[in-house]
């Protein structure tokens, strides 16, 4: 597991996530091996990576030192990767925003069945049976998003931040065929580009389905003359939503004005 993590971290910029406590501006924060919350500051100790294990099951890794969120009886700590179920978590939506997207989630340990709980009295984090209390609900805010792409207040109410394919598996693509297949998959997905792709010979637009994150790797992040769209060509389906594109360069030569 450790070697796979190092390979991934050196290959592409993984999405950092802040877990924000219910109705606050306080983020889940690593302090030594224990946890607390702090007002959002941009510190890497507030940044977490969500690693897909299997459907609905994830490792949660602190990006300051690559330590893993770990259940220890009623305590929630960080420790080195072990591969055990006490480092595996279910992330399950609880409350939706006015658009119908999940605004809050519960985070439940696979081994204990207990949820991460914020104790405001002493600013500590522990584990307890889920009771639908606000202290057990967290926003997933992708670090770096701004404006209406991020968690924001609107006239209609509070809007959840875009998370793209955060809760799906990660696939690696290196040619037109594999990229097109990944974009059309209907489940959440992080798509990592590992080779530059020249799409100038492609005659058709490419539809991006809902819930996708497209990330360029450090070694290759360019697509040439791609024609991406989020709407149905025939106008029969609703436009796609919840899409993040990071560390990508798009070059347009053959068909100017036809990038997206």
Predicted regions and their residues:
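Extracellular glycan-recognition/adhesion modules and their associated mucin-like linkers
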Residues: 8-32, 47-74, 88-122, 137-142
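Repetitive beta-strand solenoid architecture
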Residues: 13, 24, 31, 44, ...
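Extracellular beta-strand-rich solenoid/capping regions of secreted or surface-exposed proteins
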Residues: 180-188, 197-215, 221-247, 251-260
């Amino acid at each position: 597991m450790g070697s796979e993590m190092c390979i991934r971290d050196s290959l592409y910029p993984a999405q950092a996530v802040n877990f924000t406590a219910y109705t606050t501006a306080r983020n889940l924060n690593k302090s030594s091996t224990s946890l607390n919350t702090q007002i959002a500051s941009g510190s890497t100790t507030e940044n977490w990576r969500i690693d897909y294990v299997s459907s609905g099951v994830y490792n949660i890794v602190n990006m300051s030192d690559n330590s893993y969120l770990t259940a220890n009886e009623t305590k929630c700590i960080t420790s080195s990767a072990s591969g055990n179920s006490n480092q595996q978590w279910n992330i399950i939506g609880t409350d939706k925003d006015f658009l119908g997207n999940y605004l809050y989630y519960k985070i439940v340990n696979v081994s204990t069945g207990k949820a991460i709980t914020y104790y405001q009295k002493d600013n500590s984090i522990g584990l307890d049976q889920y009771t639908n209390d606000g202290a057990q609900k967290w926003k997933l805010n992708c670090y770096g998003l701004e404006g209406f792409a991020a968690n924001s207040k609107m006239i209609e109410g509070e809007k959840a931040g875009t998370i793209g394919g955060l809760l799906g598996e990660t696939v690696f693509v290196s040619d037109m065929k594999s990229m097109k297949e990944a974009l059309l998959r209907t489940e959440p997905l992080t798509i990592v580009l590992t080779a530059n792709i020249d799409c100038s010979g492609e005659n058709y637009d490419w539809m991006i389905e809902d819930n996708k994150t497209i990330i360029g790797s450090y070694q290759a992040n360019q697509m040439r003359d791609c024609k991406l769209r989020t709407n149905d060509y025939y106008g029969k389906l609703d436009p796609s939503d919840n899409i993040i594109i990071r560390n990508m360069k798009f070059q347009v030569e053959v068909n100017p004005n036809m990038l997206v």
